[in-house]
Amino acid sequence: MPQPAIAELPRWVAWLAQDADGVWWGYEVEPLQYDRGWYENEVGRRVRVGQDRPNSQWAQTLRAVP
């Protein structure tokens, strides 16, 4: 699954991850995992940054943004 271009993310995004439904999110702090995706646990900001096909391998998509 292609991920959003790093250069197009808001500067504050430090983590990138995709949920099972295919939605890509940018997070200010490392998100926590739940059964179908990721959440920010009320700490930091998050922003929707893209949509792709549902991904059964979503749990492997969490990446730190350089």
Predicted regions and their residues:
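Extracellular/surface-exposed low-complexity repeats and stalk/linker segments enriched in Gly/Pro
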Residues: M1-I6, Y34
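Amphipathic alpha-helical oligomerization segments
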Residues: P4-W24
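Assembly/interface hotspot detector across virion components, adhesins/toxins, and nucleic-acid enzymes
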Residues: A14-Q18, R36-E40, R46
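Short, surface-exposed terminal/edge motifs of secreted or surface/virion proteins that either
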Residues: G22-G37
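Low-complexity intrinsically disordered segments
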Residues: N41-P66
